[in-house]
Amino acid sequence: MSHLDNGFRSLTLQRFPATDDVNPLQAWEAADEYLLQQLDDTEIRGPVLILNDAFGALSCALAEHKPYSIGDSYISELATRENLRLNGIDESSVKFLDSTADYPQQPGVVLIKVPKTLALLEQQLRALRKVVTPQTRIIAGAKARDIHTSTLELFEKVLGPTTTTLAWKKARLINCTFNEPPLADAPQTVSWKLEGTDWTIHNHANVFSRTGLDIGARFFMQHLPENLEGEIVDLGCGNGVIGLTLLDKNPQAKVVFVDESPMAVASSRLNVETNMPEALDRCEFMINNALSGVEPFRFNAVLCNPPFHQQHALTDNVAWEMFHHARRCLKINGELYIVANRHLDYFHKLKKIFGNCTTIATNNKFVVLKAVKLGRRR
């Protein structure tokens, strides 16, 4: 846990999933402080919109203004709810919207934590363009190293005149005034042909490797299991290309597409509808934090390309949670398959959790591993 003192309220905040006490990561950053400082003497009129509030620092601080928290992360929503409870704040003080929803009209203040991808930022700025006014105070913040010329140009192109502040505690802010510059329409998704198939893959703005097949998935697809039955999971499904391949290779199986990103799950659904509509009755689509709340001993196999970062921080906490959830939800003799960068050494992590691990394939960058649920373990 970490403490954030600001002009609105003193907060105790924690990350979600929780980090270990040996090497804890903080649940807020200097950019959060810097953004809140700008509102110290501001009379807030109209709705408050907060975009990409990773663990709820801004939403908790501004809870008395009944803000809207907007983003593409179910984990961030869970973190914000947890931190509201931790600080004795009514959860109903914050309204949660995903990035594809309609934003409230004529907001008084918009606070943006700059996301990792310009594509998501552009989608969000285009959505804001439909609702903000010249009187709306628009402020964005991030680590100084994450604000680039391209970031500023995007604000200018979509919303209007843009300036930046000096760095403070290695954070910078962007101030923007809406003046409705001319702007051409943009498609909601980008699409590309998947080589070796007749499939067209469609990706929403926040999907990993949006403009082409990432090399880890490409390697994984060469070593996916075939002729499985029962239910199998594409965990952290992204655009669903692994799940699509599983549907093709396992015609007797049902595939459950799971991701914490609403845009990822929407992309997966769209890609099944576009490329294998006849298989829709063998699909389930789930926005979730890994397999939280899913009954144990349900699945025959889980397949996963786990992330090793959360927002801008490098961490294996999300991967650890995925592995533990997979073990809980697998049937006895059910199998977990993962692809990962070799340097992450997930072999020993899986062996610790499952009691076994087998290397299926390896190259100079990636490894495909399999672990089997052999019986009940603590």
From Swiss-Prot:
GO terms for cellular component: cytoplasm. It catalyses: guanosine(1835) in 23S rRNA + S-adenosyl-L-methionine = N(2)-methylguanosine(1835) in 23S rRNA + S-adenosyl-L-homocysteine + H(+). Its EC number is 2.1.1.174. One of its GO terms (molecular function) is nucleic acid binding. It is found in: Cytoplasm. Pfam families: MTS (PF05175). Keywords: Cytoplasm, Methyltransferase, rRNA processing, S-adenosyl-L-methionine, Transferase. NCBIfam families: PRK15001.1. Belongs to the methyltransferase superfamily. RlmG family. Specifically methylates the guanine in position 1835 (m2G1835) of 23S rRNA. HAMAP family: 23SrRNA_methyltr_G. This is Ribosomal RNA large subunit methyltransferase G. The lineage of its organism: Bacteria, Pseudomonadati, Pseudomonadota, Gammaproteobacteria, Enterobacterales.
